[in-house]
Amino acid sequence: MANSNMKTLHSLEGIGKIQFEGKQSKNPLAFKSYNPSEVIGGKTMKDHLRFSVAYWHTLTADGTDMFGTGTMQRAWDSYSGMDLAKARLEVAFQLFDLLDVPYFSFHDRDIAPEGDTLQETNQHLDIILERMKEYMRDSGVKLLWNTANMFKHPRFVHGAATSCHADVFAYAAAQVKKGIETAKELRAENYVFWGGREGYDTLLNTDMKRELDHMASFLHMAVDYAKEIGYTGQFLIEPKPKEPTTHQYDADAATSIAFLKQYGLDTHFKLNIEANHATLAGHTFEHELRVARIHGLLGSVDANQGNTLLGWDTDEFPTDLYATTLAMYEILQNGGLGTGGLNFDAKVRRASFELEDILYAHIAGMDAFAKGLRVAHRLIEDRVFEDVIKHRYRSFSEGIGRDISEGKANFHILEEYALKHPLIRNESGREEQLKARLNQYLLED
């Protein structure tokens, strides 16, 4: 591993690897629920949850918002350029070690600065990638996924694959080409496409059909290139309805699935579902997970939460136990996430500016999902919801209901049946009772 030059530049000295101490512990630098070696349903917690640290929020975010400049106290920010990139890399793996996470993720521009030309930018990346491979080899930490930042630079003002300018489309293709090469080089288990500016602000100047066709063509090119170079990781689309554009083409899970199926991409892509993006789309986290799951396209998760009182992507660390429990319920029903994981696409609050806050935040999120895993497993084992659902839809298991389910009925048959059975008796959905049961399981764990 590269020689350490950061020992005196941050406040993590003296902090050991975060350990599981149980729910009675008062130590803020200890896990209360997350016990990586604990076996649940035949798998360890570590294997179930597959936690990942997001490079951008953890290493590059400075706390800047629309109303104020950065607040984060990060010693490595005294560097600039490639020196800054190298310093961030070293601290990143120190943090991964303290948290004992198996994975991390990044955008290309998180890990190395953009140069004056594409060639210079790629040279910067190559320098960092060589060092990163050393850290990965020495630590055993793996790359969950990488992606291309095609939303920050002014060239992407009108989008990337959906830009009205062919030169921008070409540049974006070159950037993703390098990204897929990076994924292969680092053995990334997935590669993510998040279309930050793949959408529009007004239809008055937008050829939507052309832009959708171009985006599909771009993704097919990516599939072809991955095959060409032998990259076998899972491609992921990350839905989001808005921000920074007014309307993004991958608005939610259902919209993204329709797009993938329309353009024959659904055999090559799955979805990376983010909790806060579900909130922005007017859905619950578990709704988006369910939609992806029942279509066989749930690939990975960006673990965070939004603030329903605010209209933007707040990317808070996940602490809502209802949300983490219902999320893990869907993930367990999915048979896990395969090559995916729980990536903390989350940032500490602007007022949580000390370096230790990064540890507190990740501990909170990891504990919340560990708790959710335990409760969700018990709910499934006890068939708390499954038996209710089976009973609720029992009329489709016999008689006319079975004929409907098996495709044997038609309007003539159903009209005849309705005329003979004029009395319909519905039953209560018992929503409040089920919520009380959920509370009971949360309190008992």
Swiss-Prot record:
Binding site residues for Mg(2+) 2: 274, 277, 313, 315
GO molecular function: magnesium ion binding; xylose isomerase activity
Organism superkingdom: Bacteria
Needed cofactors: Mg(2+)
Stored PROSITE patterns: XYLOSE_ISOMERASE (PS51415)
Protein EC: 5.3.1.5
Keywords: Carbohydrate metabolism, Cytoplasm, Isomerase, Magnesium, Metal-binding, Xylose metabolism
Residues binding Mg(2+) 1, per UniProt: 238, 274, 302, 345
Active site: 107, 110
Disulfide bonds: none
GO-annotated biological processes: D-xylose metabolic process
Note accompanying the cofactor annotation: Binds 2 magnesium ions per subunit.
GO cellular component: cytoplasm
Main location: cytoplasm
Catalytic activity: alpha-D-xylose = alpha-D-xylulofuranose
Protein localization: Cytoplasm
Catalytic EC class: isomerase
Family per similarity comment: Belongs to the xylose isomerase family.
Subunit structure: Homotetramer.
Protein name: Xylose isomerase
The encoding gene: xylA
